[in-house]
Design a protein with these regions (language model features):
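Bacterial signal peptide processing site
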Residues: 30-32
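N-terminal secretory signal peptides that target proteins for export/translocation
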Residues: 1-10
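C-terminal motif of bacterial Sec signal peptides marking the signal peptidase cleavage site
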Residues: 25-28
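Beta-propeller fold detector
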Residues: 80-81, 120-128, 179-190, 250-259, ...
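Conserved blade-ending motifs and adjacent loop-strand segments that build the rim/top face
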Residues: 278, 399-419
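Blade/loop signatures of beta-propeller domains
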Residues: 52-78, 119, 177-181, 248-266, ...
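Acidic, Gly/Ser/Thr-rich repeat motifs that build Ca2+-stabilized beta-propeller blades
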Residues: 47, 52-222, 283-286, 291-302, ...
Length: 436
């Protein structure tokens, strides 16, 4: 997750292949409303031009000849409050059941429901008795509904148990549509944690129907346990599990996982692993139109990074990649005094340095809604420390450029996406906002 003590007042240079031009902030978000009914904030900014492609290449705008091109510079973004009074919310998602409900994960161990703009008083799930949330990166951290949730009632959570270890469990909705059976817990996977931070926590079903799990490197500083590049640990990885083919088993290994039979640099790899070399992939998502995978991987002392895996045939992403940690932090050798080889590594599509703009990336989603046409196809992400929100879009020459959309002033713990493709900002301080 993110630091407990937010470090504000440091500006990142949004790097697209190489270091770009610094962004400018011109407005901030007003405080959240005091009641859960929808209310428009006063958060609006004037868009500004951003990132060049290299020190010698001027920024190039993509032609705006078609409305299908994302055009963040024309967007006047605001945040509409949809819920307040939450207890340290860290995620929001829909169930894919057509109900229009939004499910909000609270760090302490509860899941709340937003239904028709109203925050229901009774939690959908309450497992506070099983969750350790004392540490800043501990708690109930992730939620994913099974693709067949409407039929099976199954959903999956990622939490830190009372012993300080990661647990991924399946639960089932109860007789009421707005409550789950806390006694239905079926443990899918447990991972021992050597420290209290870098716990990952994101769960998401991919277009292939498999459950993807993001794990941190085990914590402390600089990967002292050497987990990022260790193929014999599940820490510092992206996992891919089949949890739906046989619901009587915790999971099975998809036969197409990259290291079921193959080795990595001559070493055997745990078959659950889909990709290696991640530090703390706190939030990742799949583009619901293309199937592309986007990862916001929280950096160490200097760089925050965005990784993208373009989907291939059938809208599926390639496994077997190494995102570099702790050989590299972002696009740079780690530590910065070291020399390293990039051979065999998948580098980020964008990075930014720690500074006034932030210190801890919060990965988001490619916008596929209808309320903000200028953002369709843009990857929306933010920073927990600064509260800034950006749009990342393709630029000339296969590079990427970032556009500052808003300086929200919020502790952005997550973004959320509803069934219509509209996006939400989750504020750890206790509120959820809709991008509008």
């Amino acid at each position: 997750m993110h630091p407990a003590n937010r470090r504000r007042g440091r500006a990142p240079l949004l790097t697209v292949v190489v270091l770009p031009i610094c962004l400018v902030v011109v407005a901030a978000c007003a405080p959240a409303a005091s009641q859960p009914s929808p209310a428009t904030t006063q958060a609006q900014v004037r868009p500004v031009a951003t990132s060049g492609l290299s020190p010698t290449t001027a920024p190039t705008r993509r032609p705006q000849s078609t409305p299908l091109e994302p055009d963040p510079a024309q967007v006047r973004l605001r945040l509409d409050s949809v819920a307040t009074g939450l207890d340290r919310p860290v995620f929001a998602t829909d169930a894919g059941d057509g109900s229009g409900r939004l499910f909000v994960v609270e760090k302490g161990g509860t899941i709340r429901i937003l239904d028709g703009g109203r925050l229901l008083a009774r939690p959908f799930l309450d497992i506070r008795d099983r969750v350790l949330s004392r540490g800043s990166e501990q708690g109930l951290l992730g939620l994913a509904f099974a693709p067949d949730f409407q039929r099976s009632g199954y959903f999956y959570v990622d939490y830190i148990d009372r012993s300080g270890n990661t647990v991924i469990s399946r639960f089932q909705a109860g007789k009421s549509a707005n409550s789950a059976d806390s006694g239905s817990e079926f443990k899918v996977l447990g991972i021992d944690q050597p420290a209290s931070n870098h716990n990952g926590g994101m769960l998401a079903f991919g277009p292939d129907g498999y459950l993807y799990v993001g794990t941190g490197d085990g914590g402390r500083e600089g990967d002292p346990f050497h987990n990022g590049q260790n193929p014999q640990t599940l820490l510092g990885k992206l996992l891919r599990l089949d949890v739906t083919t046989d619901p009587t088993k915790p999971y099975t290994i998809p036969p197409s996982n990259p290291w079921v039979t193959a080795k990595y640099n001559g070493q055997a790899v745990l078959p659950e692993i889909w990709a290696i070399g991640l530090r703390n992939p706190w939030r990742f998502s799949f583009d619901r139109k293309t199937g592309d995978l986007w990862i916001g991987d929280v950096g160490q002392n200097t760089y925050e990074e965005i990784d993208r895996i373009a989907a291939g045939a059938g809208g599926r992403v390639q496994g077997g990649l190494n995102f570099g940690w702790s050989i590299m932090e972002g696009m740079h050798c780690y530590p910065d005094t070291a020399t390293c080889s990039r051979a065999g590594l998948t580098l980020p599509v964008a990075e930014y340095t720690h500074g006034a703009d932030g210190c801890s990336i919060t990965g988001g989603y490619v916008y596929r809604g209808t309320a903000i046409p200028g953002l369709v196809g843009a990857y929306i992400y933010g920073d927990y420390c600064s509260g800034r929100i950006w749009a990342l879009t393709p630029a000339a020459g296969g590079a990427w450029q970032s556009q500052l959309l808003l300086d929200s002033g919020l502790a952005i713990s997550s973004f959320g996406q509803d069934q219509a493709g509209e996006l939400y900002v989750v504020d750890l301080g206790g509120a959820v906002y809709r991008l509008a």
